[in-house]
Structure formats: structure tokens, C-alpha cells
Amino acid sequence: MKYFVVLFLVLFNYNVVGQIKVDNVGDGWVDKVNQAITLIKKVDSEKYDKLIEVCDHVTFWNGNFSTSENDHTIMISQSDILRGSVNNVAAVLVHESRHLMFRKLGIKMSEIDEETMAYIYELDFLQKIPGVEPFLIENARKRIVNPK
């Protein structure tokens, strides 16, 4: 019975999509992440497989930008969620999964080179989304040229 209670508490605080646990912080954020993960799976199964391979936890924070933490967690910024775009959240997940993949493989490079590679990966994904918001494509292209 004790194990059942622990399992219940863990599942109560997380929403699990495939193998990724998404922290439940309310305000529809979990739904937005779930929609983004579904979009990635539909649009680019290879990037979805990589995401599932390297990420097992999505959380949120109040920072100005999304990032990754340790070797398996993607932290989505409040500002990225509040933009209201599922495509943007999907782009964040794809972008940050690239950073996690580099860590997993032990690939070391300069921060600027790593950001450039992550934006190239993100842009490749964005260009496959029918009707994607132009500002997302423009931002990725701009960041490839000037990653900072």
C-alpha cells in the first residue's frame, strides 16, 4: 500500500507523455507541452525519437529564456509558454534536446558553436511545420548568424 501511495503522489505531480514527465504547474502549461510533443512526433519523427531519447523531464522557470538542466531536463521559460504558440514550445523542445544530445554524446564545443548547431536543428524542424509563424523562422535564422 505504501508503494501505491508513493506512485500516486509521483503521478499526481507530473503529467507523463510517452517517457517525458511534465511538471504540472497549472494554467494549461502541461497541455501546451503535450500538444508540442505531439506536433514534433507528427512533423518529424526523427527529432521526436531524439527528444524521447535524451529528455525525460520538462519543467518551467521564470527566466527570460528556455534552457536545459543536467543531462535530461528541459526548462521552458514562462515567456516562451506565455507566447501562446504550440509551434514555439515545440521549437524550444527540439532546440534544447539538441543541447542534451551533445551532453549525452560528450561533444564539447564553444557555446556559440553549440547554439548555432541547435538553431540549425531547430530551423530544420520549423520549416517542416505547415503554416508556422514567420517570426519563429526569422528568429532561428537570425540566431544562426548571431547566436548571442
Spans of model-derived segments:
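Active-site recognition of the HExxH zinc-binding catalytic motif
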Residues: 91-104
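Post-HExxH zinc-binding segment in Zn-dependent metallohydrolases
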Residues: 111-146
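Structural recognition of the beta-strand scaffold that forms the well-ordered cores
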Residues: 75, 100-102, 119-120
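Extracytoplasmic/secreted proteins, especially bacterial periplasmic and envelope-associated proteins
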Residues: 32-35, 88, 92, 113, ...
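Short pre-active-site segment immediately N-terminal to the catalytic Zn-binding motif
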Residues: 76-93
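Auxiliary, metal-adjacent structural segments of Zn-dependent hydrolase domains
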Residues: 17-73, 81-82
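Surface-exposed, polar/charged faces of alpha-helical domains
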Residues: 84, 106-109, 131
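Sec-dependent N-terminal signal peptides
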Residues: 3-12
